[in-house]
Amino acid sequence: MGSNAKGRTVMEVGTDGVAIITIINPPVNSLSFDVLFSLRDSYEQALRRDDVKAIVVTGAKGKFSGGFDITAFGVLQGGKGEQPNVRNISIEMITDIFEAARKPAVAAIDGLALGGGLEVAMACHARISTPTAQLGLPELQLGIIPGFGGTQRLPRLVGLSKALEMMLTSKPIKGQEAHSLGLVDAIVPPEELINTARRWALEILERRRPWVHSLHRTDKLESLAEARKIFNLARAQAKKQYPNLKHTIACIDAVETGVVSGPRAGLWKEAEEFQGLLHSDTCKSLIHIFFAQRSTTKVPGVTDLGLVPRQIKKVAIVGGGLMGSGIATALILSNYHVVLKEVNDKFLQAGIDRVRANLQSRVKKGNMTNEKFEKSISLLKGVLNYESFKDVDMVIEAVIENVSLKQQIFSDLEKYCPPHCMLATNTSTIDLELIGERIKSRDRIIGAHFFSPAHIMPLLEIVRTKHTAAQVIVDLLDVGKNIKKTPVVVGNCTGFAVNRMFFPYSQAAILLAEHGVDPYQIDRAISKFGMPMGPFRLCDLVGFGVAAATASQFVQAFPERTYKSMLIPLMQEDKNAGESTRKGFYVYDKNRKAGPNPELKKYIEKARNSSGVSVDPKLTKLPEKDIVEMIFFPVVNEACRVLAEGIAVKAADLDIAGVMGMGFPSYRGGLMFWADSLGSNYIYSRLEEWSKQYGGFFKPCGYLAERAVQGATLSAPGGHAKPRM
């Protein structure tokens, strides 16, 4: 193979006549085209050689294979030059060479056998695994389906229901469960894996063990009548759960074709569906998200300086409310020692009880053992003073949004914490410069903005000021990785990146409602677009108090472009506060089920009079497409300002922030990726048109106008301000 080859396989033949073929492509032994063609060459060589009796396929350094090399999707989607055909790999290579081999092959699985890796393993005649190895077909997370025979072989090894569940949820299973299902034939410790696989392969050759072709097994398949029921149920669930996604149905169709028309027909159907989905917007969007998520930790001028993260062993949290207890939960789950400080015994006990409840919820769901529960809770210590802060490596302040209180806490922290200690705040809106203005060591101050519930939501917004040391950012990035959060580094401003971008979201909804659009129609359109809930339902969930406080921050910071409405204050006067009072834009029954609030029209009419606006007949019958655009284009506009001001490093970071912080649909690629699919000129012209009709709220910013004139994408680099430090 050439020196530029991306990965390879090596083959060693033992004195027992077993050829060990090892996949080598760090870090996860992904199946690049180079690896696949090298694997084929190794197989063909083993089949030709008279001294080779049997084959074992494995992966280097304790990982079988993490699956098809995702960077190769660009080659397949590009449409330039000669491209490898997935059908050729699935049928001509994996089926007709590997599975049809006249010498038995055994897969020796450790670490990972995911996607294409598991598909190669299933084409072997037996599989031996370690107990903790992860096996699965997660391709649907990328908007495609398994393309190397997975839709045909998995159902024949584990049964239809389990196979569909594994593919549609993309969740891997451990080796032990795989053995109980029949996906693997034996479980052994890592040190015995290769020798066991060698013996197994020879025993197949000697007919002491079955020589199984997975593709032709039928003993695990249900009867045709039962299979049809399973397919119908799976389709109904997929349409309900993923109404905007076609690839879930395509996966079910491929499996069904194999069951009804035979495995060869199923392989052809799988290849046909894979090829079509590969060029879909959904696939391109999800692959963008995949790479964008992995690039958030690359911060120019910070992570390229060669700094090594310092070891953080002990973390203190000030405030044991919902956020503080959630952050404490996330930390102790990752084996950090945590000191939780409160102002009195009552609040402290309540905070500890919340952490305990968070952990017990995991035990109840089967996600945590009682042993792990005891170990985790033992890492938590509750205190009422700062005495235990003298040896902490990091403090996270998580008290209410009160500037003077936070300033006092940071003054105390500077006195009691060691000089190396990071001083972090979980504020969601307050200027960090203001919080730290009373202390001397401002290079240690950083924002660690978690999203509620903090132990579940995947995003960590890391906020840097112009004083924050690069070492402190590197340290917090490392903590974020350790607690399994996706960190996004942003600059310091009102609302930072996520809340700043999305502050027009609810404002646009209220503006439309006051101009005659039915609020429930707005929520339906936005939910249908793919958001977890519409803006009015979201406002009820967070509560009117929080919504009003956040709105006032933005009115203060950006008075020229906020839509000032009395709708929420008027509703608050009559004790409507959202879901917590069972009455807001919706009314809630005792089971928290939402229904329309019959009094809402009255409040909208009052707010309309207060704002001096009237119903626009054009808006009363606004199509769903226009509702989506009038809600989200102002959000895109604000995101452009965030980029122009250097608050975000790159547009892809905003895509991840929107997906993980606000639930923007990942299958649309994130806010900026979606906006670029529509075009900067289109978004600019629509906003310009609306600004003439409905005021400055819709006025497109300079960055957007410039991109529209140039015909450039919003996410293209260049024209950004220097990142705010």
Curated annotation (Swiss-Prot):
GO terms for cellular component: glyoxysome. One of its GO terms (molecular function) is delta(3)-delta(2)-enoyl-CoA isomerase activity. It comes from the Eukaryota. One of its GO terms (biological process) is fatty acid beta-oxidation. Keywords: Fatty acid metabolism, Glyoxysome, Isomerase, Lipid metabolism, Lyase, Multifunctional enzyme, NAD, Oxidoreductase, Peroxisome. It is found in: Glyoxysome. The epimerase and isomerase activities are contained in the N-terminal region while the dehydrogenase activity is in the C-terminal region. It holds the Pfam family 3HCDH. It catalyses: a (3S)-3-hydroxyacyl-CoA = a (2E)-enoyl-CoA + H2O; a 4-saturated-(3S)-3-hydroxyacyl-CoA = a (3E)-enoyl-CoA + H2O; a (3Z)-enoyl-CoA = a 4-saturated (2E)-enoyl-CoA; a (3E)-enoyl-CoA = a 4-saturated (2E)-enoyl-CoA. This is Glyoxysomal fatty acid beta-oxidation multifunctional protein MFP-a. The keyword Lyase applies. Its main location: other. Pathway: Lipid metabolism; fatty acid beta-oxidation. In the N-terminal section; belongs to the enoyl-CoA hydratase/isomerase family. In the central section; belongs to the 3-hydroxyacyl-CoA dehydrogenase family. Its EC number is 4.2.1.17, 5.1.2.3, 5.3.3.8, 1.1.1.35. PROSITE patterns: 3HCDH (PS00067), ENOYL_COA_HYDRATASE (PS00166).
